[in-house]
Regions:
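Short amphipathic alpha-helical segment within the helicase RecA-like ATPase core
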Residues: 1-234
Length: 234
């Protein structure tokens, strides 16, 4: 999955799907409000009618909204704006991934990192998004004879309204994606059967990882070396 950042007016952005938030307390996030004005207040009408209440776990897909260039708008419930903290933000991202799984999309643009979340800025919000998306993408298949199809997103783009936040957002995405990949590697090793994931196999994986990154080094000890070091659990 590739991550990127764009700075644009939400109504002017051409994308297969634009993911935006809706609060439970009837107040629309600033970017959603801006988009709603361009779309003839369609989101406000849907919220008023009760088609979406804004609770975390809810979503609603709109297609080809007049005045908006995005092919689809995916409205995501974000709960009460006054209670939005990092934990709830992560829950929103998880539900967003589940909602995206229902549609045949390979590319999305997300405005969720523009939400005001207690005590965290754009870098941390971007990091959490990248980490959660990468880890949600993981599926074990190494020893399965029948490979099941699963949702794969090729590109996730963050939409920002402030150009000065681009650098921090990119940094957050890079960190989050790296953490997510590391978590997936650990999960894969844990899921492999013991006759494959042997100490020798783990040693080879560690050495291979070290060759790919100049900041890492690895040394595999023999049984005799471990014994001399007093590692008596052999």
């Amino acid at each position: 999955m590739q991550f990127s950042v764009k700075t644009s007016k939400p109504e002017s952005l051409s994308t297969p799907c634009l993911v935006i938030g809706v609060f439970e307390d009837k107040n629309l996030p600033e970017l959603t409000e801006q988009l709603d004005k361009a779309g003839g207040k369609i989101i406000h009408k849907l919220v008023t009618a009760g088609d979406i209440n804004g609770k975390i776990g809810e979503h609603l897909l709109l297609q080809k909204v007049e005045g908006v260039r995005a092919q689809r708008l995916l409205l995501i419930g974000c709960g009460k704006s006054s209670e939005l903290d990092a934990k709830k933000y992560c829950s929103i991202l998880t539900h967003t991934w589940k909602a995206l799984q229902k549609y045949t999309l390979t590319e999305v643009t997300l405005a969720l990192p523009t939400l005001a979340v207690k005590d965290i800025g754009i870098e941390r919000k971007a990091e959490l998004l990248a980490r959660l998306f990468v880890t949600n993408e993981y599926h074990y298949s190494a020893t399965l004879s029948k490979k099941s199809k699963h949702f794969q997103l090729k590109e996730a783009c963050l939409l920002l309204t402030e150009g000065r936040e681009r650098s921090a957002a990119n940094k957050g995405l890079e960190i989050g994606a790296a953490i997510g990949k590391g978590m997936n590697t650990a999960r894969e090793l844990g899921n492999l059967p013991a006759n494959i994931c042997t100490p020798t196999y783990l040693g080879k994986q560690a050495l291979e990882l070290a060759t790919k990154n100049k900041l890492l080094s690895a040394k595999v000890l023999t049984e005799a070396q471990m014994k001399r070091l007093g590692m008596h659990s052999l």
